[in-house]
Amino acid sequence: MTSKLDQLKKFTTVVADTGDFGAIKSLEPEDATTNPSLLLKAASDVNNAQMLADAFSGAKGDIGLACDRFAVAIGQEILKVVPGRVSTEVDARLSFDTNALIERSERLIGLYDAAGIKRDRVLIKLAATWEGIRAAEKLEKDGIQTNLTLLFSFAQAIACAEAGVFLISPFVGRIYDWYKKSSGTDYVGAEDPGVQSVTRIYNYYKANDFKTVVMGASFRNLNQIEQLAGCDRLTISTDLLKKLAEDTGTLERKLAPGNAGEARQSLTESQFRWASNEDAMATEKLAEGIRQFARDQEKLEALLSAKA
């Protein structure tokens, strides 16, 4: 019998949301994504102790650079076991500074360049703030492809498409979490607000021939993944990937080009900020996500500082 994971791979590019090389190798995803939380977990693994030490020793006391070196080292190892791309995230504390985001992105891609990794195998992850989207627009023009993350609203999706970013990561599970907590309702299937958000974005992009890739992220259960089967890409935790690999039930494609979508829109900065302000869920989850990634970045810096 064919597993649901293998069925999913027929119409969706499967991406592993982890820094665990062993798990990636066994599950055979096309790509992999990392973030500060996953890097912190990897840094705490004794098997990566030498990698952490090397990152610090090569940074000459610059802890920020040491963190970037470690992120790229993890990315290099991941690229040994996936045929596609790895996403490496910029320090979340820079999320509201366009120039700083560009500079840090250029440093990350420079480290990959120095390691002999081709740019078409790396995506630089930026939070989908207005400043992050503007940074991504410039980076894309300079040949550095981006993954806009912490995406919770249709306004963010509109702005990312207009900026010509390579890929967006709408967060299914965190949207679901907010609405479940707010309403007390345990949403299932097509009624899940996170599923509805990604479906709307996917249909809008396809209807208007945007080339930006839609990669659903942050899943809480298998049903959310199944409801988005057919999405360009889905980045999935190893636990859920294993469950998909063990399930031999039938998986039907839910998303496909050709479905009805809304007319093309564009947003000025003030319109973007107003739309964000009016969306309580998106405002709260974006701020929360940036804070969480910033705290984990600080913990990673503390681990590296301890080696001084």
Curated annotation (Swiss-Prot):
Annotated active site: 125
Reactions this protein catalyses: D-sedoheptulose 7-phosphate + D-glyceraldehyde 3-phosphate = D-erythrose 4-phosphate + beta-D-fructose 6-phosphate
Coiled-coil ranges (or none): none
Annotated Gene Ontology cellular component terms: cytosol
Location(s) in or outside the cell: Cytoplasm
Keywords: Cytoplasm, Pentose shunt, Schiff base, Transferase
UniProt-recorded Gene Ontology molecular function terms: transaldolase activity
EC number: 2.2.1.2
Swiss-Prot/TrEMBL GO biological process terms: carbohydrate metabolic process; pentose-phosphate shunt
Main enzyme class: transferase
Main location group: cytoplasm
Pathway info: Carbohydrate degradation; pentose phosphate pathway; D-glyceraldehyde 3-phosphate and beta-D-fructose 6-phosphate from D-ribose 5-phosphate and D-xylulose 5-phosphate (non-oxidative stage): step 2/3
Self-association and partners: Homodimer.
Function: Transaldolase is important for the balance of metabolites in the pentose-phosphate pathway.
Family statement drawn from the similarity comment of this UniProt entry: Belongs to the transaldolase family. Type 1 subfamily.
Name of protein: Transaldolase
Provenance organism: Pseudomonas savastanoi pv. phaseolicola (strain 1448A / Race 6)
Taxonomy of the source species: Bacteria, Pseudomonadati, Pseudomonadota, Gammaproteobacteria, Pseudomonadales
Chain's gene name: tal
